[in-house]
Amino acid sequence: MRYNYNDGSLKIDLDEELDMKACKTLRTVIDGYIMRYQPREFIIDLSDVKFMDSSGIGLLIGRYNLIKFMDSKMIVLNPTHSIK
C-alpha cells in the first residue's frame, strides 16, 4: 500500500490481495490517514489488486461510509477485470 496527500485529496494505492488478513490491518491504517488528513476527496486505486474477497468489499464500503459522513467524496480507480 502506498498513499499520497495533496491539496485536499488523499490517494491510496492498494496492491495484491484484499482478503480478511490484509483488510484487518488496512482498515486501521487507512482510517488513520482519513482522520489525520480529513480529505475532501478520497481516491482508492485498485489497479494492482489481483484478488478481493468479501472483506475487501467491506473495506471499501466502510471507507465510503466514513467519507460520506465527512461530506467528502470517494473515487475508486482501475478495478481489474478479476475484481469487477
PLM segments and residue spans:
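STAS-typified acidic loop motif
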Residues: 1-28
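Amphipathic alpha-helical interaction surfaces in cytosolic regulatory modules
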Residues: 20-84
